[in-house]
């Protein structure tokens, strides 16, 4: 089974994905990690971004200035679209390849894709999990985890599809508002109800 894990900003997608990978015989891929890899010096995404934006967003040794890029894309919607137009197709290729490897090896695929519904890329998943969290909790967690200002966290959330729309498109919703023990119980139920029953 090919499973996508998505949700809002700082909702706990990585935590849910990590648990799933311990419970399932699966391959795992993260769209965020795939995109970060594409911004490593010399990678295809890095080359395309440097050609598009020039040297101002790169350090002297060629590294992408991630903080400067983050500020730019969330203050300038056009820049965000430019970056996504570079990275999303490259990440998509990696995710599709991971799915093919999973098929060959008769394993599940767990793919963490934060912008699954916002992306123009087409995917073929058997199950889409949306990790849901209240906006005030997401902002608080983002400020602790990413050391960002509340205003930036709010703008990131506003730049994505409303959570209600994501939930409406989900095959399964995991609420992560409270203690992670409650979240873990929901993941166990998902595995038992949506995967084990289908064997």
Curated annotation (Swiss-Prot):
Please report the organism this UniProt entry assigns to the protein: Desulfotalea psychrophila (strain LSv54 / DSM 12343)
* Alphabetical UniProt keywords: ATP-binding, Coenzyme A biosynthesis, Cytoplasm, Kinase, Nucleotide-binding, Transferase
Entry's EC annotation: 2.7.1.24
Stored InterPro entries: Depp_CoAkinase, P-loop_NTPase
Q: Which reaction does it catalyse?
A: 3'-dephospho-CoA + ATP = ADP + CoA + H(+)
Protein known as = Dephospho-CoA kinase
Q: List the disulfide bonds.
A: none
Q: Name one Pfam family in it.
A: CoaE
Gene Ontology CC annotations of this record: cytoplasm
The biological process GO terms on file are: coenzyme A biosynthetic process
For this protein, the record's CDD domains field holds: DPCK
Q: Where in the cell is it found?
A: Cytoplasm
Q: HAMAP family, from UniProt?
A: Dephospho_CoA_kinase
Q: What class of enzyme is it?
A: transferase
The answer to whether the entry has keyword Cytoplasm is yes
Q: Which family does it belong to?
A: Belongs to the CoaE family.
Q: Can you provide one Gene Ontology molecular function annotated for this UniProt record? A: ATP binding
Q: What does the protein in this record do?
A: Catalyzes the phosphorylation of the 3'-hydroxyl group of dephosphocoenzyme A to form coenzyme A.
* Sequence positions that bind ATP: 10-15
Pathway(s) = Cofactor biosynthesis; coenzyme A biosynthesis; CoA from (R)-pantothenate: step 5/5
The superkingdom listed in its UniProt entry is: Bacteria
PANTHER family assigned: BIFUNCTIONAL COENZYME A SYNTHASE-RELATED (PTHR10695:SF46), DEPHOSPHO-COA KINASE-RELATED (PTHR10695)
Name of the gene:
coaE
């Amino acid at each position: 089974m090919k499973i996508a894990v998505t949700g809002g900003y700082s909702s706990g997608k990585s935590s849910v994905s990590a648990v799933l990978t311990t419970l399932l015989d699966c391959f795992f891929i993260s769209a965020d990690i795939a995109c970060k890899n594409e911004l490593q010096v010399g990678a295809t995404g890095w080359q395309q971004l440097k050609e598009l934006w020039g040297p101002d967003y790169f350090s002297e040794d060629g590294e992408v200035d991630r903080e400067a890029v983050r500020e730019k894309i969330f203050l300038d919607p056009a820049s965000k679209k430019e970056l996504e137009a570079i990275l999303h197709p490259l990440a998509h290729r990696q995710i599709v390849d991971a799915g093919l490897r999973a098929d060959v090896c008769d394993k599940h695929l767990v793919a963490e894709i934060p912008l699954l519904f916002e992306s123009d890329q087409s995917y073929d998943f058997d199950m889409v999990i949306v990790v849901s969290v209240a906006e005030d909790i997401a902002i608080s967690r983002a400020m602790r985890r990413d050391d960002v200002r509340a205003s930036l966290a709010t703008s990131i959330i506003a730049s994505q599809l409303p959570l209600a729309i994501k939930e409406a498109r989900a095959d399964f919703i995991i609420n992560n508002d409270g203690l992670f023990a409650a979240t873990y119980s929901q993941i166990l139920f998902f595995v038992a109800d949506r995967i084990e029953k289908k064997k």
